[in-house]
UniProtKB/Swiss-Prot annotation:
Pfam families: Herpes_TK
Protein name, entry field: Thymidine kinase
GO biological process assignments: DNA biosynthetic process; TMP biosynthetic process
Gene name of this polypeptide: TK
Function comment: Catalyzes the transfer of the gamma-phospho group of ATP to thymidine to generate dTMP in the salvage pathway of pyrimidine synthesis. The dTMP serves as a substrate for DNA polymerase during viral DNA replication. Allows the virus to be reactivated and to grow in non-proliferative cells lacking a high concentration of phosphorylated nucleic acid precursors.
Location of the active site: E60
Keyword Transit peptide set for record: no
Binding site for substrate: Y78, Q102, R198
Enzymatic class: transferase
Subunit structure: Homodimer.
EC number: 2.7.1.21
Species: Equine herpesvirus 1 (strain Ab4p) (EHV-1)
InterPro entries found in the cross-reference section: Herpes_TK, P-loop_NTPase
Keyword annotations of the record: ATP-binding, DNA synthesis, Early protein, Kinase, Nucleotide-binding, Transferase
Disulfide bond sites: none
């Protein structure tokens, strides 16, 4: 966190009752493949005012994953894949364990989202409105509920059944959400991963390649929905998501962000799979409802991309330069103070 958030009462009403000061909030979710530098960028943004406004930072819930409970989920999910590859764990058992660990990644994000989403206010403002407060989150729930499970599914570490179950937990985003998908060239990405050498974490190039593609799909999904289209547009002509599709999705940068994407460039394409279709090749209604829900939950998210190849300060400046393009909401000073308290508590409890 940087400077204190806007607080106090701006004026009193005609009756003499205090009127809460209005506060314009920009909220940013830094996301992307692990090890790029988003956490460092978020901390730097919080160490000084972003665009002149106070900045709060909510870090990754590392303690929740590693020390608060009996199992370290980061070490556990990688160890599960190692045991499968060594023949010590059957593929079906490994898939079930992987899904369990992936759900553990999601829990703290869902809790945090539930606690904070009502504090941002419901009135969306014109893009370019100067914020009174910038709130930076280290990942959105879409990371652990959709993107990472999707990558695990495409690799073969999780089933479609488990993926759909995870996707269903994604909370609906209120107006004003901004995701910045952080990117980096592959060589520098690997160098940074080796430098940080996080305990239990592995440099899994297949997972990294797949995640890069999935995050491109996320950006394309946002662009697709922003154009006014829905997942049913072009569904009939979309080919099945078969082993060829999965193989392509694991190849480095096989998917790229597109300003005018087709349905095949989006996250929705991977769900046209036999497990979700009837004997005629028609998607079952219950699964169609799941895709409807996913579409509604993603619709209020604006997705941006930012290259983090510079110094930490340069990376923070890159993200800050996007703020005039971002959505913002109108809240009040009491909610802003609640966000400040929440950020202070989350930082204190989630550090390891």
């Amino acid at each position: 966190m940087a400077a204190r958030v806007p607080s106090g009462e701006a004026r009193r009403s005609a009756s003499g009752a205090p009127v809460r000061r209005q506060v314009t909030i920009v909220r940013i979710y830094l996301d992307g493949v692990y090890g790029i530098g988003k956490s460092t960028t978020g901390r730097v943004m919080a160490s000084a005012a972003s665009g002149g406004s106070p900045t709060l930072y909510f870090p990754e819930p590392m303690a929740y994953w590693r020390t608060l409970f009996e199992a370290d989920v980061i070490s556990g999910i990688y160890d599960t894949q190692n045991r499968k590859q060594q023949g010590d764990l059957a593929a079906d058992d490994a898939a079930s364990i992987t899904a369990h660990y992936q759900s553990r990644f999601t829990t703290p994000y869902l809790i945090l989202h539930d606690h904070t989403f009502g504090l941002f206010g419901g009135d969306s403002l014109q893009r370019g409105t100067r914020p009174d407060l910038t709130v930076v989150f280290d990942r959105h729930p879409v990371a652990s509920a959709v993107c990472f499970p999707a990558a695990r599914y495409l690799i073969g570490d999780m089933s479609m059944c488990a993926l759909i179950a995870m996707v269903a937990t994604l909370p609906r985003e209120p107006q004003g959400g901004n995701i910045v998908v952080t990117t980096l060239n592959v060589d520098e990405h690997v160098r940074r991963l080796r430098t940080r050498a996080r305990i239990g974490e592995q440099i899994d190039m297949k997972l990294i390649a797949t995640l890069r593609n999935v995050y491109s799909m996320l950006a394309n999904t946002s662009n697709f929905l922003r154009s006014g289209r829905v997942w049913r547009d072009g569904w009939g002509e979309l080919p099945l998501s078969c082993e060829t599709y999965k193989h392509r999705a694991t190849q480095m940068d096989a998917f790229q962000e597109r300003e005018s994407p087709e349905l095949s460039d989006t996250l929705f394409a991977m769900f046209k799979t036999p497990e979700l279709l009837d004997d005629r090749g028609v998607i079952l209604e219950v699964h169609a409802w799941a895709l409807d829900a996913l579409m509604l939950k993603l619709r209020n998210l604006s997705v941006f991309c930012a290259d983090l190849s510079g110094t930490p300060r340069q990376c923070a400046a890159t993200v800050e330069s996007l703020i005039p393009l971002m959505s913002s909401t109108l809240s009040d000073s009491e909610s802003a103070s609640s966000l400040e308290r929440a950020a202070r508590t989350f930082n204190a409890e989630m550090g390891v």
